[in-house]
Swiss-Prot record:
Protein name, entry field: NLP effector protein 9
Glycoprotein listed as a keyword: yes
Gene: NLP9
Compartments in which it is found: Secreted
Source superkingdom: Eukaryota
Length: 279
C-alpha cells in the first residue's frame, strides 16, 4: 500500500492559514488547527513534513572535518517545555525510557556544524568504552499525522561496530487534547523488522513513557525502567546536521530512521492498526 493512497493523513505544515509555510514555532494559536484529527484524506510528500531547520552559527564550516570521534560530538540542547510548541511538548511528554541491557549507550550522531560520529575504532565486548557519554545523551524525534493517529518517532544512535540506529514510534490519539493517550508502540528489533503493542502492556509503561530496552542491536518493550535522553526534533536541527543525516554514506550505509529518505516509509512499514484508523 503506497503512502500516497493512505486516507486521512495530515502532516504539520502552515500553508493552511496564510497560503505559505511558516516556522512551526512561530505561534501556537495558528498551530492549534493543525494538530486536530483530520476530517478527510490528505495526499502529501516528505516536503510537507516539518522541514524548517535551525540556523547555523559556524561561519567556517568548510574547514571542519566531516567526521569526528564518537565521544567528541556535542549534543543539541533540548528545548524547555515552556519554549516549545504543542507538538514539541507532546514529543517531550512521551519520551521513552531506554534501558541499556546489552550494548553501547546512545550517543549524539551529529553536531550543529554537521560533523558526524565516526563510531568506535575497535569493538569492545564489555561496552565499557561506550558507556554513558561524557558530553551528554541524545535522542532524535520527528512527528506527523498518519491516518487519524499522531505518530512520534524517536531514534537513537549507537556507536558500536557496526554502527547502529534504532527507533521507536509512539502512536497517540492527538497532541492537542488535555489528556493525550498512547494507542500503541512500535520498536525496531534485532531482526531488522519491527514489533508492536496496541495498546502497550501497562507493565511496560511508566506514566506517559513506554519502557524500552536496547539488547543485541535491537529494541524491545521492557518492564525494566531506563532513562531519558536529551530530545531534539528534526526541525530543530541545523541545516548542516539535517544534510549530514540525509546522506546515505554518513553512517556507512546504515539507515537513519527519521531522515527525509526513511521517515515516512518507516511509519508506513510500522503501521500496527486496522484500517479504521486510516479513515
Amino acid at each position: 500500500m503506497k503512502i500516497s493512497n493512505l486516507l486521512g493523513v495530515l502532516v504539520v505544515f502552515l500553508a493552511v492559514v496564510k497560503g505559505q509555510k511558516k516556522d512551526e514555532g512561530s505561534d501556537d494559536s495558528e498551530l492549534l488547527a493543525l494538530v486536530t484529527v483530520p476530517d478527510g484524506p490528505v495526499i502529501f510528500s516528505i516536503e510537507q513534513v516539518e522541514q524548517v531547520a535551525a540556523p547555523s552559527t559556524d561561519k567556517h564550516l568548510s574547514k571542519l572535518k566531516p567526521k569526528i570521534a564518537y565521544d567528541k560530538v556535542e549534543p543539541f540542547e533540548m528545548a524547555q517545555p515552556s519554549e516549545s510548541t504543542i507538538t514539541e511538548k507532546a514529543a517531550i511528554k512521551f519520551r521513552p525510557k531506554l534501558y541499556i541491557a546489552n550494548g553501547c549507550h546512545a550517543y549524539p550522531a551529529v553536531n550543529k556544524a554537521g560533523q558526524i560520529s565516526k563510531g568506535m575504532k575497535t569493538a569492545d565486548p564489555t561496552f565499557a568504552t561506550c558507556g554513558k557519554p561524557s558530553k551528554g545523551t541524545q535522542v532524535y524525534g520527528r512527528s506527523a499525522w498518519f491516518g487519524t493517529v499522531w505518530a512520534i518517532m524517536y531514534a537513537w544512535y549507537f556507536p558500536d561496530i557496526p554502527l547502529d540506529w534504532e527507533y521507536a514510534i509512539v502512536w497517540t490519539n492527538n497532541p492537542n487534547v488535555s489528556n493525550p493517550v498512547i494507542l500503541g508502540v512500535t520498536v525496531s528489533n534485532s531482526e531488522g523488522s519491527t514489533t508492536s503493542q496496541t495498546p502497550p502492556d501497562p507493565a511496560m509503561v511508566d506514566g506517559r513513557s513506554v519502557k524500552i530496552a536496547y539488547n543485541n542491536k535491537g529494541l524491545e518493550s521492557s518492564t525494566t525502567l531506563g532513562g531519558t535522553q536529551n530530545l531534539v526534533m528534526w526541525h530543530q536541527l541545523t541545516v548542516e546536521a539535517q544534510e549530514a543525516l540525509n546522506k546515505k554514506a554518513s553512517f556507512n550505509g546504515v539507515q537513519v530512521p527519521m531522515n527525509d529518505n526513511h521517515f515516512l516509509r518507516n511509519l508506513e512499514a510500522s503501521w500496527p492498526f486496522s484500517k479504521e484508523y486510516l479513515q
